[in-house]
Amino acid sequence: SSFDAALERGCQVMALCTGGELRQRAERKGQPVWVFQHTGQPRTAIPYSFGMLLALVCRLGLARVEESELQETFSVLREGREQLSAAAELSVNPAKRLAGQLLNRNVVIFAAGELEVIARRWKTQINELAKAWAVFEGLPESNHNTLAGLEFPESLLERTSALFLRSGLDHPRNALRLTATQQAFMMAGTGVDAVHARGQSRLAQMWSLLQFGDYVSYYLALDYGVDPTPVDALTRLKASLAAVK
């Protein structure tokens, strides 16, 4: 396992987990353990995994987050929760509207810099909640290859929606690349939409986009008429792998 490999290489190790085998291994080896209680799907544990990792790197002096950044992030998320909740009508709920636009379409999510990990989150949430196809692309890398594939098959392009996660904190060159890539996809006949981060700090902006993507994925699942909670395909895969020792 990665835990054992890290110990063999002499790394300092700390376990963050809900218990189980990892906790037992860490305690047997005398390594520190942070245990948190979570019983839902792994994808819903991101506040724990992110918050605990952030606390760890800050305590180690590897990062610094101002209290004002945290408070702004909490405020932005509370506002987003009200705006995007199921109680909010379609006319004033952008997550519901975007989900409707993605119905029966292939989805590709673009982002640059630190927001690339948020694009990955959008992709995996659409996969797991809506049981729908989605991919993500990071810039500038995708400008070296993806744009060359905007010719065929035309029937696929017509049923593709390209989403661009944007931030006022994007590097100027990345912002230029995002705009140019949006235009290229539009000219190719795909659906194009941009989602802009809210807040002033990078932390608030990242979490605002993550929150928005989670709501979009949830509403897309409802539009498809599927239960967003189970991931039967992954359960079957794990079972088949576990059967082979």
Name each model feature, range by range.
Residues 40, 58-160, 244-245:
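Active-site phosphate/pyrophosphate-binding segments
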Residues 227-245:
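Short, small/acidic-rich helices and loops at N termini and domain boundaries
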Residues 12-14, 32-34, 106-108, 132-135, ...:
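Structural motif
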Residues 56-66, 130-131, 217-230:
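Short helix-capping/linker segments at secondary-structure and domain boundaries
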Residues 1-80, 100, 167-172, 179-191:
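Glycine-rich phosphate-binding loops that contact phosphosugars or nucleotide phosphates
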Residues 148-232:
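C-terminal active-site/capping subdomain that shapes the small-molecule cofactor and substrate pocket
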Residues 45-52, 122, 177, 208, ...:
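Catalytic-loop motifs flanking and including active-site residues across diverse enzymes
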